[in-house]
Amino acid sequence: MAQWGTFDELWVIARRADRLEALKEQVPFPVRPISLDLTDPQALELYRDLLENARPDVGLLANVAGFGKFGRYDQIPLADSLKMIDLNCKALVAMTELTLPYMKRGAKLLNLDSLSAFQPVPYLNVYASTKAFVLSYTRSLARELRPRGIRVMAVSPGWVKTEFFDHALQTSNDAVTYYNRLYEAKDVMKTALHDLYRTKKDVSIHGLPVRWQVRLVKLLPHKLVMDIWMRQQKHNKLPDED
């Protein structure tokens, strides 16, 4: 955790209060646990009030909350698709824009997207689209904030061993079956913090295979990339061709 720098206090925002309390013993700073559902507009107003009352000097904002469901478009409830957009896109933008007035030169902003941000991904269509938004938003914001001396970077991991991954597969119904490699979350974050503090990159990508895949999908037609993905998932025909 020393790589994070030195802070007077760490604000940790999530829905589950028990997880927030457990985090207190894992970091070397005083922790303020804040239980909020960021898809609730009222929660964002509460966050705005917290900022206005505390008027903190924010040294680092890490937007890493996310929600995903994998599967055919007709297998994922509309409410879940809209929740992905609300949390992965709308809440991230709100947290960023509410916090930026409290960030000075030298502050850092980290947004979590995904390898799926670089290509269209059948059976992850809404999730991957939200991550493409995060990547584009983060890179353009990085350029805008450069004159202010605020460092902005996206983190684009491949498959990662997390509780999120397990939940995302619950609706998959075998639509997504092939994962070439699962990375440890701590290794992804270690690379991200190195890149954030020691490089000028606007995108951090952990793992040589993931970096090569990003390069490859930039060169190949997206139609071919999607066809390869479908074959990897053992879907040689589209659903309406069955």
Language-model segment annotations:
Residues 114:
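Residue(s) in the substrate-gating loop at a strand-loop-helix junction
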Residues 27-42:
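Rossmann-fold cofactor-recognition segment
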Residues 1-9:
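Canonical Rossmann dinucleotide-binding motif of NAD(H)/NADP(H)-dependent dehydrogenases/reductases
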Residues 96, 130:
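Active-site helix of classical SDR
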Residues 72-73, 80-83:
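Substrate-binding pocket helix/loop in short-chain dehydrogenase/reductase
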